[in-house]
Amino acid sequence: MDKLYSLQNGTDIRGVAYKDDKSDLEITLTREDVKNLVRGFATWIIDKDKKDHIKISIGTDSRLTGPDFRQACVEALTEIGVDVVDCGMATTPAMFMSTIIDGYKCDGAIMFTASHMPYVYNGLKMFTSQGCLEKSDLKDVIDICVAGNFVDGNSKGNLIEKDLIEDYAQILVDKIRAGVDSPENYEKPLAGMKIIVDAGNGAGGFFADKVLARLGADTQGSQFLNPDGMFSNHIPNPENKEAMASICQATLDNKGDLGIIFDTDVDRAAIVGSDGRPINKNALIALISSIILEEHPQTTIVTDSVTSNGLAKFIKARGGIHHRFKRGYKNVINEAIRLNEEGRESHLAIETSGHAAIKENYFLDDGAYLISKILVKAAKLYRESQDIGQLISDLDEALEDKEIRLKIEDKDFRSYANKLIKSLSEKIKDIDGWAEVADNYEGIRVDCYDEKGWFLMRSSLHEPLLVINFESDIESGCDMINEKLTALIK
């Protein structure tokens, strides 16, 4: 049972769950592990909420082991008296919503997913109505599993099957209709628009027919909507260059007004403009920031640490406050929540990875909700013969960017990285044309004036790696910065 600790990846459980002749990896997450983990989760809820009887919803993305793990979950939970709401194929954000929306209001929710990881992986994300379990909460669940202190049910729990995605999709449809509030065509505010969806064979295919088509959009030309746990076409990841190239080309080929791409479990997304240009990473943050700032002037936009100087300038020009924080979507979300609790208004927490959480939506990182928010604005602009990309026409984007990941051999890799960063901070003071950025919350960020760029050096969140991100506005600028930096840290 102790091995369960090694499966914890921040706020998630992840492991190798499937083996075939294409993979050399050994299975680390088994059916029995799943049973123990969900029993531990149920026990944790019962102990926390002081309830005798609870209800937990379960769902999966398109991964090959999803159905078997879902069945194992049903068996384990009903055996200890827990009622189970089987939502079938779902999305991670929808599973959270099952803890709060009428007709569900589950005490907990479990999503089987491993995000954009290769097909052999699977994992679990656990929710209550307060959101995804924190890292410390998940450890408490594993502690219960290791100790074997599971609750005993007096009677067998009930199994209820519900179409959560249908109900969740209707929430999005209603949101878009109300947001556009079209006097000409309230029911179908996207009529006339051509919108291409790429679900990457994950769980996001529903968005084309259950949301866009119902709103009048033409989605012909959409691709990889069918669930396929082998992810045969491309990795379902808005940060992946191949995936973005695929949706960009599909948008151009089909003369789309907009392209949309989701990751496997739909907690992340990105879009493509009618010109085929990707709107992800800094551009996506700029776009949704522009929309949020129209509704909430001067609000604080919390981002991760690797956002560009051009983005900071863009947000400031629109009257917003850019709070550049740490990597890790949970870090970014929790920071926005903290700022609000301190009286500093923040309506958006977003990572360059495409995780975006909006205050009005429970600070839930929800790719489909993010896209719905953008679609409301896009529909209004379409009626004025304008394109969504015009909102970020003045965003300064770097000529080049680069990321280097260096393996740290030292066993105490965090301590090693911290010492290296501290030493570098001292050396930077003697480098003409370089200046350490003062308001920085992760690693060290340095503006490089001669190279018209910057770099950020930090320790990886989960791996023994030193990660260095670069941007520059001149050709070969990233290499120039790296060459100078390498000489400093040798």
Where are these regions (language model features)?
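An N-terminal, well-structured beta->alpha segment
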Residues: 1-73, 79-80, 158-195
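Conserved phosphate/anionic-ligand binding catalytic regions in large, soluble enzymes, centered on
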Residues: 5-19, 199, 203, 348-352, ...
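N-terminal small/polar loop signature for handling phosphorylated ligands or for N-terminal nucleophile
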Residues: 43, 55-121, 210-272
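Proline/glycine-rich low-complexity loops and linkers
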Residues: 78, 87-88, 92, 142-174, ...
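Gly/Ser/Thr-enriched, mixed-charge loops and adjacent short helices
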Residues: 103, 120-254
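A short, gly/pro- and small-residue-rich
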Residues: 119-146, 272-288, 361-372
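Phosphate-binding and adjacent anionic-ligand microenvironments
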Residues: 297-490
